[in-house]
């Protein structure tokens, strides 16, 4: 369960950094 949230959060953070 937390794995899915972690993956989405990771993509979100990458978009914010860019």
From Swiss-Prot:
It is found in: Nucleus; Chromosome. Its main location: nucleus. It comes from the Eukaryota. One of its GO terms (cellular component) is nucleus. The keyword Transmembrane does not apply. Signal peptide: none annotated. GO terms for molecular function: DNA binding. Keywords: Chromosome, DNA-binding, Nucleosome core, Nucleus. Core component of nucleosome. Nucleosomes wrap and compact DNA into chromatin, limiting DNA accessibility to the cellular machineries which require DNA as a template. Histones thereby play a central role in transcription regulation, DNA repair, DNA replication and chromosomal stability. DNA accessibility is regulated via a complex set of post-translational modifications of histones, also called histone code, and nucleosome remodeling. The nucleosome is a histone octamer containing two molecules each of H2A, H2B, H3 and H4 assembled in one H3-H4 heterotetramer and two H2A-H2B heterodimers. The octamer wraps approximately 147 bp of DNA. Belongs to the histone H4 family. This is Histone H4.
């Amino acid at each position: 369960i937390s794995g899915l949230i972690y993956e989405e959060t990771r993509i979100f953070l990458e978009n914010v950094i860019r």
